Amino acid sequence: LWSRGLGDVYKRQAQMAQKYFDRCPWGDKITLMQGPALESLPKIKGPIDLSFIDADKVNYMNYYNHLVEITRPGGLIMLDNALWSGAVLDPVEESDHALARMNTLVFDDPRVHNLLLPVRDGVMVAQKKA
């Protein structure tokens, strides 16, 4: 199984992605969900091997908490924008605070090993423990 679900809240981007999936040799193994992730995520049944979150920052913790439950032991959850141009160090905006809380949550979560990659805007990687 290559992918259980990929999604985008924006219809136009979801349609564009679907065109590429249709041309891909593994396209029949990709399920594209169009709509808010908080509505789509409960439809994905585990276990999953890898997830990559790059969405509305204020819901990162909600996405993470759902995904860690359905990720197989050894599986990865990757969260984009973990450094947020340095704004997580001195948060001002709601998204700054949300990402700072998310980083703390992952760092303190006994269910995962974690690694913060200082690549571009930062990628937090959480590996579910066995």
For each feature predicted by the language model, list its residue ranges:
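Cofactor-binding loops of NAD(P)H-dependent oxidoreductases
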Residues: 35, 53-55
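Short active-site oxyanion
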Residues: 29, 51, 111-113
